[in-house]
Every structure is written in C-alpha cells, then in structure tokens.
Amino acid sequence: MQVIKLQILFTPELVHRFFIFFLIISTTSCGVFKKSKKISPRDGVVYYAKTYLGTPYVFGGNTKAGIDCSGLIHNAYRMQGYRVPRTVDELRKKGKRISVDRAKKGDIIFFRTSKKRKLTHAGIVVENKNGIPKFIHASTSKGVIISSIGNSYWER
C-alpha cells in the first residue's frame, strides 16, 4: 500500500483570494446589494425636471445654462422616452383639459401670463395636496423654481 502525502501551502495570496471569494458570497447572499427600485414615468418626469432647479431662464433655452418653460417640459418628458412638442402653443393642443384640482404629478398645467387670451406659460405638477397643485416651471425672473397654484399670482 502506498501513501500519498498532500501538502497544501496556505500562502498569503491564497488566503487573500479565499477571503475575497467568501466576502463576495456572504454579501450577495445577505441582501447587502439591493436591486434598484423602478420609478413610475410620472415620478421620472418630475425627478428629471427637478435637476434643473436654480437654472436661469433663457427664452428658447433648453440646457442647464438656461432654459424656458417649454424647454423644461420638453427635456423632462424626453428623458422618459416621450416625444412632446417644444412650444407652449403646441403642447396645449396635445393634452386633454381637466380641472386643476384633479391634476396629478407629471401633468402639464398652462397659464395666461398676459391680458391676451393666449396661453403663454406652462409647468409640470410635482404634487397635488387638497386640490392645490405645486408645479415646477421656468420663471422669467427667478429661473427654474417650484410654485404653488395657491399663490395669488397664479389665481388671477
């Protein structure tokens, strides 16, 4: 009978490799790495629009260097895979009219900011509590901000 003697050498490199292997196995099996949570298209539109907060107003602009209200809407929807028109006038033709108190996150709301009957401004609803929406928009004086419909300026 012949006896074979095996000698295993635990070199520092081998120990290090085993440690890394067991670390990877233990962290993945313990749920340390969580799957990313999917967000709704409405949440995605609002999330992306909020990345423009503080961006200055520039008529016809559509970048972080300067943006107008329809540029903000166009970019936020485009990042979610939607093709929407670039002007307020064209945007208003695409949707259906609902009452302001029914507006949901991600909906587009329109305003007349002059005495003319034409709609000249728009924003994206970020929330609607008790029928009073808050919306993100590009203000000519303050840049991209969040405002409330309850503000007297928007009630006129």
Place the predicted regions along the sequence by residue.
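Short polar/acidic secondary-structure junctions
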Residues: S114-K116, N128
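Extracytoplasmic/secreted envelope proteins and their assembly/folding machinery
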Residues: R42-V46, K50, S70-H74, A103, ...
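Sec-dependent bacterial lipoprotein signal peptides
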Residues: M1-T28
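Catalytic cysteine-centered active-site loop
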Residues: P56-K105
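Aromatic- and glycine-rich peptidoglycan recognition patches
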Residues: G31-K37, P41, Y82, K96-I98, ...
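Short, Lys/Arg- and Gly-enriched loop/turn segments at beta-strand edges
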Residues: K116-A122
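Post-signal peptide N-terminal segment of mature Sec-exported envelope proteins
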Residues: K34-F59
